[in-house]
């Protein structure tokens, strides 16, 4: 999709300094995340790209809380299904009980995302956000993922909720999406158009 007429777009930030920062982007998910505060877990930029300006990954405490919640849920379900606590004597049931929370724990620990002035990366890959050719939102429930593909074949995806948990990260990505839409022929699916590009939710106030 490209624009039929001239449109005044926000300026592109400098690849090294990130200035000027893009204007605040509209959000679909207005709930705050639980970001990691340990700078030692800050992702690195893709090879040959400018510095990381913003990043997000769930905090360790959030991951541990999620593990405990899922473990407790599986414990309750196991007791209900077996009609009591007799299953606790069977090691096979313990393996089944632990499988789901362990897998969720490992998945959550490995997920991250970062943005520079003109790129976005996650644990699934990276793209040049001003050279996008495809913007799609897919997935059901409360955690749909935004899939991005650029002109060089780069591709990545991440949960929209997490991308928008860091407003400044989302500002960078959204600015690249809007520029791509007005300068390139970009394939956009209906879900992305409604929930990302034409979203009508109020903008969230910055919290510095």
Explain the meaning of each model-derived region.
Residues 91-138:
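Conserved beta-hairpin
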Residues 122-165:
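Acidic, Ser/Thr-rich low-complexity segments on the non-lumenal side of membrane proteins
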Residues 6, 137, 178:
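Residue-level marker of positions within ordered structural domains that often coincide
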Residues 73-80, 97-99, 150, 158, ...:
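Hydrophobic, well-ordered secondary-structure segments
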Residues 65-70, 90-96:
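Hydrophobic H-region at the start of alpha-helical membrane spans
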Residues 151-208:
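A membrane-cytosol interface segment of integral membrane proteins
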Residues 1-81, 204-208:
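N-terminal membrane-targeting/pre-transmembrane regions
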Residues 76-94:
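Membrane interfacial helix motifs at helix-loop boundaries and amphipathic/re-entrant anchors
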């Amino acid at each position: 999709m490209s624009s039929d007429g001239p449109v005044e777009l926000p300026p592109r930030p400098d690849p090294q300094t990130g200035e000027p920062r893009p204007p605040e982007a509209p959000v679909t998910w207005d709930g705050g995340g639980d970001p990691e505060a340990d700078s030692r877990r800050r992702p690195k930029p893709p090879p040959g790209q400018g510095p990381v300006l913003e990043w997000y990954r769930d905090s360790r405490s959030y991951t541990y809380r999620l593990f405990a919640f899922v473990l407790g849920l599986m414990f309750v379900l196991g007791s209900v299904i077996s009609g009591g606590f007799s299953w606790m004597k069977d090691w096979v049931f313990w393996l089944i009980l632990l499988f789901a929370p362990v897998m969720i724990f490992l998945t959550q620990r490995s997920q991250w995302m970062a943005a520079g002035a003109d790129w976005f990366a996650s644990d699934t890959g990276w793209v040049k956000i001003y050279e996008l050719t495809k913007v799609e939102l897919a997935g059901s429930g409360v955690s749909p993922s935004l899939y991005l593909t650029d002109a060089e074949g780069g591709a990545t995806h991440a949960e929209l909720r997490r991308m928008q948990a860091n407003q400044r990260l989302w500002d960078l990505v959204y600015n690249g999406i809007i520029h791509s839409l007005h300068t390139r022929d970009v394939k956009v699916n209906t879900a992305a158009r409604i929930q990302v590009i034409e979203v009508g939710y109020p903008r969230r106030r910055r919290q510095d």
